[in-house]
Structures are given as C-alpha cells and as structure tokens.
C-alpha cells in the first residue's frame, strides 16, 4: 500500500490552518476546513487514499462522527464502496450496537447500526477519521466494528498527534496509517 512522499505531506500540512490556544490554552488546533476549502489539496488527499486502498480488498469504509464522515464518504464514493457512519449516542434510528470509552473526566460512547455491514460475517472494513489524539474514540470504534463480526483491517487518519500516543492504543487491534504525523 502506498505511503505519501515528503513533498505531498508538506503540501497537505501547509493546507491545514493551525490555531494556537484553541479550544483552551496550550492546545494547537488543526483546522481541516482550510484543506476542505482547497480543491487541489482535498482532491490530492482523496486521490492518495484511493491509490493506497484501491487494491486492499476492502468491503466497507466506516467513518467516525463527524469529520471522519467527510473523508470516509469521499473515499467510499471514489472507490465505489459503501460508507458506514459511526455515531454518537441516539443519532441512529435503527437497532444499534454501542461501545463505551473513557474520557479524561467521564465516559462517552459510539454506536453503529446492528446490520451496518450486512449479513455476512468477516466484512473487511477501513476505519477513517480526520485525527487521532488519545485514541479513545478510535479504539472504541474498532471494538464496535469487531462486535458486528466484521474486521477492521486498518484505521486511517489524516493527522496523528504522536505525542498523545493514541496510535499506541490501536496497534494491538488493527493496522494504522496516518497521512501526517505532527
């Protein structure tokens, strides 16, 4: 599977706005809206991901609410694959499976429709999100996919905040690909 070269990484990184001290002091927020608003950068990213996954024998692409929907749905459309949303509680209208995960000061949860990957066990799923930080949501999402008897073959992120070690939480569950590591 293809990995982006340094020139491509710099192009994408330069298309993402960094906002200091948002949402609180000491945080550098990676604002992907500038990448989304740049048709060359957005299409470059989706082209790269399509080239990486076109021969990966993937059956579905799942995206984590909400920015994972953007990249996941765009990639699914490009690869002509079905897209499955992984959502926050009480957002899906049909019967759901749930996975709770810990936050710094509490617990949150992700959900998926019970029939999201069809009747056949063993569907091969690519999980997409814009960013991995501490890894709690991504880990819960992989576990949720596994609850459906599908297999998360890889988790893909536009950005990995490596100092927060979120990818470390996933390594025992699935392969990980981050386009950019910051």
Curated annotation (Swiss-Prot):
One of its GO terms (molecular function) is AMP binding. It is an enzyme of class 2 (transferase). The keyword Cytoplasm applies. It catalyses: AMP + diphosphate = 5-phospho-alpha-D-ribose 1-diphosphate + adenine. It is found in: Cytoplasm. One of its GO terms (cellular component) is cytoplasm. One of its GO terms (biological process) is purine ribonucleoside salvage. Pathway: Purine metabolism; AMP biosynthesis via salvage pathway; AMP from adenine: step 1/1. Coiled coil: none annotated. Keywords: Cytoplasm, Glycosyltransferase, Purine salvage, Transferase. Homodimer. This is Adenine phosphoribosyltransferase. It comes from Campylobacter concisus (strain 13826). The gene is apt.
């Amino acid at each position: 599977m293809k990995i982006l070269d340094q020139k491509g990484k710099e192009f994408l990184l330069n298309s993402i706005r960094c906002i200091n001290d948002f949402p609180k002091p000491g945080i550098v927020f990676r604002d992907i809206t500038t990448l989304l608003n740049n048709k060359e950068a957005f299409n470059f990213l989706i082209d790269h991901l399509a080239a990486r996954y076109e021969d990966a024998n993937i059956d579905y692409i799942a995206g984590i609410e909400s920015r994972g929907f953007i990249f996941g749905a765009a990639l699914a459309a490009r690869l002509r694959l079905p897209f499955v949303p992984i959502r926050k509680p009480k957002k899906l209208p049909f019967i759901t499976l749930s996975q709770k995960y810990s936050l710094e000061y509490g617990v949150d949860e992700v959900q998926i429709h019970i029939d999201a990957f069809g009747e056949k066990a063993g569907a091969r799923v690519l999980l997409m999100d814009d960013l991995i930080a501490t890894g709690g949501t991504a880990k819960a999402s992989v576990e949720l996919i596994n609850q459906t008897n599908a297999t998360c073959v890889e988790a893909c992120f536009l950005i990995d905040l490596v100092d927060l070690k979120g990818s470390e939480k996933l390594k025992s569950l699935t392969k990980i690909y981050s386009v950019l590591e910051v």
